[in-house]
């Protein structure tokens, strides 16, 4: 059994909080051969047939449980020979990210988690548009006039980039913020002039937010993320803590 983990540099992940590390560790403990690749290493080789290949490096665990791989010893493989490919790299969700999904779309045999087509077609922060009845008042836009109108109506809001992660760029702003228009222009420019997400500020945020894990539509587990004192962010990367929940 061979698993490929497409991810950021394994040597830089925090083994105490990174879920990718836990997936790799458990796979290795079960005797599965695990490999690492950077999404930039994937390529299409077309000559009568189309082969999707990548350079990969085999993963192992050191005695201190840190992940180990040899960056200088890379092996070129046909990705059809993998049993499963885990797409685990962090955003930005940009053209490099999207181009990689086009290549992975061509694979027939490996199980790809999560499906590359679905990752591309349903960016996680846009999925809420399918559930408006469960979503607080929200605006997704890069139009300054529309954003200011929304902020003035809702008084206090949370703003965040549409394609970020780990709490990056999340801020609370008020309708009476000084130089609001200039702030918004600079904020949008900082995040590649892409649309941003603005939501009405929910005052019960201290209770945390619940992440639910579904497998084929069935609930497999859940965790409550609670922000630390004096913070509005419940993201684990931003200091949020995990609390047991039903």
Language model features with spans:
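Extreme N-terminal starter segment of soluble prokaryotic enzymes
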Residues: 1-4
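Phosphate-binding site of ATP-dependent enzymes
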Residues: 145, 152-155, 163-246
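A broad, low-specificity signal for short, low-complexity segments enriched in glycine/proline
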Residues: 41-51, 74-76, 118-121, 158-160, ...
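Short, well-ordered coil/turn residues at beta-beta hairpins
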Residues: 6, 86-89, 161
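Short acidic, glycine-rich loop/turn motifs
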Residues: 60-61, 161-163
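N-terminal cationic-hydrophobic initiation segments that often serve targeting/anchoring roles
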Residues: 28, 105, 151, 188-189
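Conserved N-proximal alpha/beta basic substrate-recognition cap immediately N-terminal to
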Residues: 11-142, 146
């Amino acid at each position: 059994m061979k698993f490929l983990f497409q991810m950021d540099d394994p040597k830089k992940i925090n083994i105490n909080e990174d879920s990718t590390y836990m997936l790799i560790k458990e796979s290795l403990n079960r005797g599965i051969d695990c490999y690492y690749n950077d999404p930039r290493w994937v390529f299409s080789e077309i000559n009568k047939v189309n082969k999707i290949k990548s350079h990969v490096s085999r993963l192992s665990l050191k005695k201190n449980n840190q992940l180990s791989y040899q960056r200088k010893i890379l092996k070129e493989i046909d990705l059809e020979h993998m049993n499963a490919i885990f797409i685990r790299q962090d955003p930005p969700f940009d053209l490099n990210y999207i181009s990689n999904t086009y290549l992975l779309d061509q694979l027939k045999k490996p199980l790809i988690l999560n499906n590359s087509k679905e990752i591309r077609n349903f960016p996680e922060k846009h999925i809420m548009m399918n559930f408006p009845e469960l979503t607080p008042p929200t605006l997704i836009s890069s139009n300054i006039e529309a954003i200011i109108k929304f902020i003035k109506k809702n008084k206090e809001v949370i703003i965040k980039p549409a394609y970020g992660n780990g709490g990056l760029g999340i801020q609370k702003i008020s309708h009476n913020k000084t130089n609001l228009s200039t702030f918004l222009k600079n904020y949008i420019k900082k995040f590649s002039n892409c649309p941003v997400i603005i939501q009405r500020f929910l005052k019960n945020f201290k209770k945390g937010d619940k992440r639910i894990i579904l497998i084929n539509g069935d609930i497999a587990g859940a965790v409550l993320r609670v922000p630390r004192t004096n913070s509005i962010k419940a993201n684990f990367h931003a200091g949020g803590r995990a609390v047991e929940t039903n």
